[in-house]
């Protein structure tokens, strides 16, 4: 068979493969479409219902004088409990993000410079990643509360005089217990991101700079940190977004007052006074918008890094 006579056969084979791939892709789309539709309907429907209820639609109170507007949003920021919750939420989210990033960076740099037992150290830092946050929060509560394990040990050895003498770490107004729970979970997560970045092309750049006589501190400032900074920034956005919007950890380890915004929204929603429902929905909407903006920033950042 000559080359010219084989060209139609090659074109037919190529077209057949393309069409087969299209059919396979369509089949995959149709297979996952029911699940996607259910998830999108539940999420988008609930989100839209929350927005509508926050501006006065679908009110549970029959009030002919009730107007459609943003009164619930203004009422939320005028509420002292909400203002205290906003301060606590930002404090917990910022401290958790900064501390987890700094500690994870130090651990990752130490592991990357360790030649022996590196895989063992990585496994140790990542063993608690599959553990749910609610389990971690429960463990912190059972360990560091005034009637917890550490308090009983210190009382047994005479370090503290009874459970009331043990410092308040959980269910405190500052949020120490919440921050501890986030650190225990987010440090390994940040280590995964940073270690992955440290295993990339930055290794060759670091070796080249080392060969040219650059000190480790200089390489760290001029080579390593600038290269892994996008990975660190992406991780901090994720950690901050989760810490900002999480509910179960502040509910278990926080106080009734002040509480984080997510807990305050739940308290208002379940309050016997049904007039607080729009305010609760307004808080939930604001929290969702903030988290959505953070997710959008994360996606844009990853897209820019992908182009590079």
Language model: regions and residue ranges:
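Transmembrane alpha-helical segments of polytopic membrane transport and secretion proteins
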Residues: 1-33, 116-118, 297-308
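Interhelical loop and adjacent transmembrane-helix boundary motif
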Residues: 22-27, 73-75, 244, 251-293, ...
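Transmembrane alpha-helices
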Residues: 34-44, 127, 131, 180, ...
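Short membrane-interfacial helix/loop motifs at transmembrane-helix boundaries
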Residues: 43-80, 148, 157, 254-256, ...
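C-terminal transmembrane helix and the adjacent membrane-cytosol boundary/short C-terminal tail
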Residues: 56, 195-205, 278-308
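Transmembrane alpha-helix signature in integral membrane proteins
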Residues: 80-113, 123
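Membrane-interfacial helix termini and adjacent extracytoplasmic/periplasmic loops
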Residues: 138-183, 253-257
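Membrane-cytosol interface at the C-terminal ends of specific transmembrane alpha-helices
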Residues: 164-210
């Amino acid at each position: 068979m000559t080359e010219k006579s084989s060209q139609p056969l090659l074109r037919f084979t190529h077209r057949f493969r393309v069409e087969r791939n299209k059919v396979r892709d369509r089949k995959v789309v149709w297979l996952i479409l029911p699940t996607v539709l259910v998830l999108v309907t539940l999420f988008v429907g609930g989100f839209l219902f929350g927005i509508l209820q926050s501006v006065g639609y679908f009110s549970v109170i029959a009030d002919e004088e009730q107007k459609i507007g943003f009164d619930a949003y203004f009422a939320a920021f005028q509420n002292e409990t909400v203002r205290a919750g906003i301060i606590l939420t930002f404090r917990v989210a910022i401290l958790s993000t900064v501390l987890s990033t700094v500690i994870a960076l130090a651990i990752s740099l130490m592991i990357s410079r360790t030649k022996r037992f590196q895989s063992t150290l990585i496994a140790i830092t990542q063993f608690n990643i599959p553990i749910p946050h609610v389990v971690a929060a429960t463990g912190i509560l059972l360990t560091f509360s005034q009637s917890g394990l550490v308090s009983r040990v210190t009382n047994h050895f005479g370090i503290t005089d009874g459970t009331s003498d043990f410092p308040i770490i959980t269910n405190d107004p500052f949020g120490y217990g919440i921050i501890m729970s986030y650190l225990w979970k987010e440090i390994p997560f940040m280590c995964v991101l940073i270690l992955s970045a440290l295993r990339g092309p930055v290794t060759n750049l670091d070796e080249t700079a080392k060969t040219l006589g650059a000190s480790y501190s200089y390489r760290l400032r001029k080579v390593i940190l600038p290269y892994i900074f996008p990975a660190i920034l992406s991780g901090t956005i994720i950690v901050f977004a989760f810490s900002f919007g999480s509910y179960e950890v502040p509910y278990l380890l926080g106080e009734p007052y002040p509480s984080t915004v997510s807990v305050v929204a739940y308290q208002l929603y379940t309050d016997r006074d049904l007039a607080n429902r729009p305010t609760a929905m307004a808080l939930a909407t604001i929290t969702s918008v903030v988290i959505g903006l953070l997710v959008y920033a994360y996606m844009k950042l990853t897209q820019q890094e992908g182009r590079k």
